[in-house]
UniProtKB/Swiss-Prot annotation:
EC numbers for this chain: 4.1.1.31
UniProt keyword list: Carbon dioxide fixation, Lyase, Magnesium
Location of the active site: H138, K583
Substrates-to-products reaction catalysed: oxaloacetate + phosphate = phosphoenolpyruvate + hydrogencarbonate
GO biological process per UniProt: carbon fixation; oxaloacetate metabolic process; tricarboxylic acid cycle
Gene Ontology molecular-function annotations: magnesium ion binding; phosphoenolpyruvate carboxylase activity
NCBIfam families in the cross-refs: PRK00009.1 (NF000584)
Biological source species: Streptococcus pyogenes serotype M3 (strain ATCC BAA-595 / MGAS315)
Name of protein: Phosphoenolpyruvate carboxylase
Gene Ontology cellular-component terms listed: cytosol
Disulfide bonds: none
A Pfam family: PEPcase
Family affiliation: Belongs to the PEPCase type 1 family.
Amino acid sequence: MPLKKLESSNNQTIIAEEVALLKEMLENITRRMIGDDAFTVIESIMVLSEKQDYIELEKVVANISNQEMEVISRYFSILPLLINISEDVDLAYEINHQNNTDTDYLGKLALTIKDLAGKDNGKDILEQVNVVPVLTAHPTQVQRKTILELTTHIHKLLRKYRDAKAGVINLEKWRQELYRYIEMIMQTDIIREKKLQVKNEIKNVMQYYDGSLIQAVTKLTTEYKNLAQKHGLELDNPKPITMGMWIGGDRDGNPFVTAETLCLSATVQSEVILNYYIDKLAALYRTFSLSSTLVQPNSEVERLASLSQDQSIYRGNEPYRRAFHYIQSRLKQTQIQLTNQPAARMSSSVGLNTSAWSSPASLENPILAYDSPVDFKADLKAIEQSLLDNGNSALIEGDLREVMQAVDIFGFFLASIDMRQDSSVQEACVAELLKGANIVDDYSSLSETEKCDVLLQQLMEEPRTLSSAAVAKSDLLEKELAIYTTARELKDKLGEEVIKQHIISHTESVSDMFELAIMLKEVGLVDQQRARVQIVPLFETIEDLDNARDIMAAYLSHDIVKSWIATNRNYQEIMLGYSDSNKDGGYLASGWTLYKAQNELTAIGEEHGVKITFFHGRGGTVGRGGGPSYDAITSQPFGSIKDRIRLTEQGEIIENKYGNKDVAYYHLEMLISASINRMVTQMITDPNEIDSFREIMDSIVADSNTIYRKLVFDNPHFYDYFFEASPIKEVSSLNIGSRPAARKTITEITGLRAIPWVFSWSQNRIMFPGWYGVGSAFKRYIDRAQGNLERLQHMYQTWPFFHSLLSNVDMVLSKSNMNIAFQYAQLAESQDVRDVFYEILDEWQLTKNVILAIQDHDDLLEDNPSLKHSLKSRLPYFNVLNYIQIELIKRWRNNQLDENDEKLIHTTINGIATGLRNSG
């Protein structure tokens, strides 16, 4: 019997009760705000939406005044948000229940390690596996931080629903508190008045570490070690999960990312993790009241206690407390040294006893900062050993064990920061350096071979830098060199791990990578033997992915590159772009090209004796590589995951996965289990069939790519259709991120960033990037020969990659709505442009029919009943928002709204994104 997934709970009764209660409270609050007469409009809208009487719904919405629109759009935006919270609460409950009752589920770590423990290389795999979720600031998290904080309070209250219902806590008081928070959220601005700055994005993402990720990663790593030990495997400091971050270092297309934001990103991380340690030490100080008259500590604990400046007269016989005080004092000095300021108390989870803890360091016996996390851990280990010597092993568990594990994982910062820049920027900077040094006057005009010759000569034979104080530099070059200089300083200060990778967007040639090496050399991060920052190419378009094999083969053939890779444990990371490849060639072409590229790049690495590891640039939507993480990882090519995998976590996905520590634990558990299972298991039923499967896919994908590009790039009306029949213009003005919607002025589809492209197709409910071109391509293959449908059905049943590919299309189609999409099409100004919709509609219907035929299903989402039920319960609410949005866009474009009313459109964008849950 296959194990069930816990993607969402099956306890629909509880969810229904909670949603009914939340809806009742929201209705009462809204009635009080607008009155009974106005609320009847909301009630009539709901009835029409549930009956799917969209013609009448459109008429009613058209007669709502701008003033009434504000509360009505807010109501229908808040309602899906409350439903989300209820579902998340129940998922967290289900996760705890399954773990505490020792129930098996798909991806459960205990099962994964049990299966692996019996293999000869099981211990090696468990020690080496490393999964790295990389949190990014891509602008798809439309909710304000304030709204997220309020939803956290509601989440905590709903966790108590069962207790309130059973009378364990006072039901009436519980209802009153819940009502208060819903009232607050209903009367709080949903949309930001001003665009986020990078510093806001850094601060915002830190709340996930402070609130859930530190605890979840620490708990999971401890459980990982304990499970291995249970099966006789003693692991030496494994790191199954470490975190990565782009915020503050990703300057591709974002002029607001600077040397200052890079420094701030690292500094705030140190502040948060050191505050966490300080809080833990405060808790240990309060509880470790062991008296030396009863338990004699070892000499090292006595030494630590003697160095404490705790002035309390009551601590004379409490050496452990004084030892913890001394350690905490050193942490405070460390925080001052690393952040250049005292603790800012970003968290308030544990207060400090200032009379005992704030004693200043005396001049005679100054408290010194820790030189490294190793020294901090050594002091904790001394306390652990003393407890073991006295038979107090039980006292080690809890806060002491947790903080020791956290030090092993995080050290003095939370996540390794990636730097990223577009290859064209690097080329411009290198061209300026070479010209200023009188080496090459017009570098950009050289051939690829000539470029590599010039760059290699500088890297291998010239120890001096190209830049000189005597030569004036452009603002761009100054800014880039400042960022690299800051990176070097941070590595010197916080350790090599704080910045490990630099990603090159739009890598198209070997010279792109050597150009980055030149820039790194300028600040001392690269020399002939060593690269302190790994050079990571990002292959994004279909063409670049097709060329990736040859590019990497040429790059890896150079001796200097092999020297650099050798300093990185013989790993070479390659980033794969899901977004641009999809925008370039459609869903099938993107997915298949990425699959083949991994196979080819893995083989090239083996030829050169290099371990190729992949960094998957996945977004929240299927059109940007999204979908269930477990399925996405286990459907990767066998052999493509060595012992390390990185993947981006973006936008609203961060809140969905990591907003709660229990759900965060579960998602991290899925990532580890999926990675291990993919490393050791050939998932396909019969590996001998893979060659024939590949031939079939090559044929289908070629057709799909042609069909997709014919509409997107060859139809002269498609560009206007996208810009007129979607809210792209309104999305671009929404204050949801620090980065512009395009790298330059948008004059064609290729110039638009993938995120607003996908986000806008989600808003108009076409979900175009997740399915267009799929139906016609499969239909052509099915019609080509008798038995082809059966072949596709067999592939779906036996090949995880193909199964995942089609399941994602199934999910996307279920969230689309062609009736609503038709209404958006009417926003287009000319009939020729509006007619593009009918091409899309025909392909949508064909895709739905073909997908169901291959799956042998009667309806969409037959394999995912919980999502099907969830969508059924929420669709009426956010379908209304689409009709409201369409009406508001009409008014806005016809100058019937003033600038203050534009936020009404933004409110609907927020609500639709909230209802869909993975929109960008």
